[in-house]
């Protein structure tokens, strides 16, 4: 073979270098939105990733981690408050010449879940190779190079490997471990390949178990380990296949309960996911996903458990914190009265002043704050420009920027005082009360109607999927000179996390509680003024304000273990749901079973309904979804099966009777929700016609389980009357 010319060699060398540069490019995708409402009402005004944590915007900790991880390109996927995030980044050090990576903000305004964001990411074609997927609320000092090396090793060994989860070992009851969404990982003990994932109920003294489909273990040879001692910060190293899988499965909304579980149980994808577990006790990793973890991580930062992520590292340009004994941090230009006492684990920002006789410990004070005389502040977080007047007591509370607390005010544990709120003198704010400057009116997740409110202003929820909020200024709460409205979200009313933050406090002081069903006439908005011909356009009704997310236990009577259609059919549909089979495959298997066992379509409808209800209850009792979210998710995805199981008006009525029967034996905390959303979903999907719904209703008994559905029936009847009136007018 003739020797290569110098020109050919130079060209090939240049090509190789160019390829190496491409291969070395390491991208990071940051999900700036959590798509949750746990930090409402504050996140109605500012994005969670810009809320201050130890006087540093939360996203700075994530970007610092990415800088140490060797990332070259960072894409910030922004939805809620995207303009604020973009403005902050443009004025930050990360846009300077010395930034270790390039930063691009992607306006993913329409995204309403992690799944939507991943599908948007796939559509944009930004991913060049393996990338790091991380939430914008992560605080960690881990050595990422070890995790990346583990990922590359597994990728070389396993051609089906598509992702590596980066997990941190800790006690199951560790305070930074999620108590909202805890989970167990079933791993191959030798390789750390994830075999199964299951959400588990929050620690409550109840026993729980992990149910694994034996089919998942058919090809497995080795030893399994069940890990309930891992902190999952949602830090993942992903291949380009991950966004593509979200694209192919449009119903995937969540990273773990949908994507991870779906991949592991799919008999079509045949992809593998591994877990890198950091066992180094010096490595810290946590997510600020709730008020309790906000408190815990703040205290860990002050106590220097997150070193070098500590206040005196001055992560943000312009910060000037210095460290003193007992974990006290001070910026310059602060004024401390001679008789004030600054206790352990306290940080005070620039230009803040503290009056005579005031005591502060285990707290963070922002910049330009004014703290009066004889004030007591413990385990609380005061943000920039806040004013706390004389003789006030704050315990485990949040006071947002520009808020004012009057003289002789007591903030009980769990209090959240929103931006610009004013609390008058001599007031006591009860446990867990949240106060906002103005009422919040938002579009609910069904997207159709809003409840009436005294304000015309609208603010977006943290995740864009909000629930209407009752808000009325209460002089008893904020005082004559005060400014603010009690805030209580229907979603949050069932959230136990606030109680965690305050030490099992209660909601006794809330002005408006929404823990029980709210079935007021005002809950239903009027139908559009446009003429609607009967059956030509299906009406849409939002009933979100009528539903709370109280849950309860479900006990099922399994009956005899016989090989009959009841058992086989139920197992078939359940397996289809768990493994996320396509609808046609599930129906084919079920129909084959029906013919082989010579049963009626009534039996088919019965086992299908039972399987759907069982999955809804599973979501609820494991704390994975609220009753409303669970019923909506299952009926919307799998209710379409009934279109090929009902063929006459009588069978439509029979289906509704079955759903009512299955719902009636559920826990009373959510059985009405399951029945109502089942009926409404079947109507929306045109599985059952309006007249057959009314026939079912009129023929049945007025049981308690029908209470919530009654409003839907009333709406149907009134809308039908309007149609009749319009038809009469047209005929005239």
Swiss-Prot record:
- Keywords of this entry: Cytoplasm, Initiation factor, Protein biosynthesis
InterPro entries assigned to the protein according to its UniProt record, in alphabetical order: ARM-type_fold, eIF-2B_epsilon_N, eIF2B_epsilon, NTP_transferase_dom, Nucleotide-diphossugar_trans, Trimer_LpxA-like_sf, W2_domain, W2_eIF2B_epsilon
Which BP terms does GO give this entry?
A: cytoplasmic translational initiation; translational initiation
GO MF terms held by the record: guanyl-nucleotide exchange factor activity; translation initiation factor activity; translation initiation factor binding
Leader sequence range is: none
The reply on keyword RNA-binding is no
Chief location category: cytoplasm
Q: Does the keyword Cytoplasm apply?
A: yes
PROSITE patterns (alphabetical)? W2
The record ties this protein, via Pfam families, to: LbH_EIF2B, NTP_transferase, W2
Task: Identify the residues that the record assigns to the W2 domain, covering every copy.
Answer: 559-726
Where does the record place it? Cytoplasm, Cytosol
Annotated GO CC locations: cytosol; eukaryotic translation initiation factor 2B complex
What's the subunit arrangement here? Component of the translation initiation factor 2B (eIF2B) complex which is a heterodecamer of two sets of five different subunits: alpha, beta, gamma, delta and epsilon. Subunits alpha, beta and delta comprise a regulatory subcomplex and subunits epsilon and gamma comprise a catalytic subcomplex. Within the complex, the hexameric regulatory complex resides at the center, with the two heterodimeric catalytic subcomplexes bound on opposite sides.
Q: What does this protein do?
A: Acts as a component of the translation initiation factor 2B (eIF2B) complex, which catalyzes the exchange of GDP for GTP on the eukaryotic initiation factor 2 (eIF2) complex gamma subunit. Its guanine nucleotide exchange factor activity is repressed when bound to eIF2 complex phosphorylated on the alpha subunit, thereby limiting the amount of methionyl-initiator methionine tRNA available to the ribosome and consequently global translation is repressed.
The family annotation for this protein states: Belongs to the eIF-2B gamma/epsilon subunits family.
Name of the protein this chain belongs to: Translation initiation factor eIF2B subunit epsilon
Q: Which lineage is the organism of this entry classified under, starting from the top rank? A: Eukaryota, Fungi, Dikarya, Ascomycota, Saccharomycotina
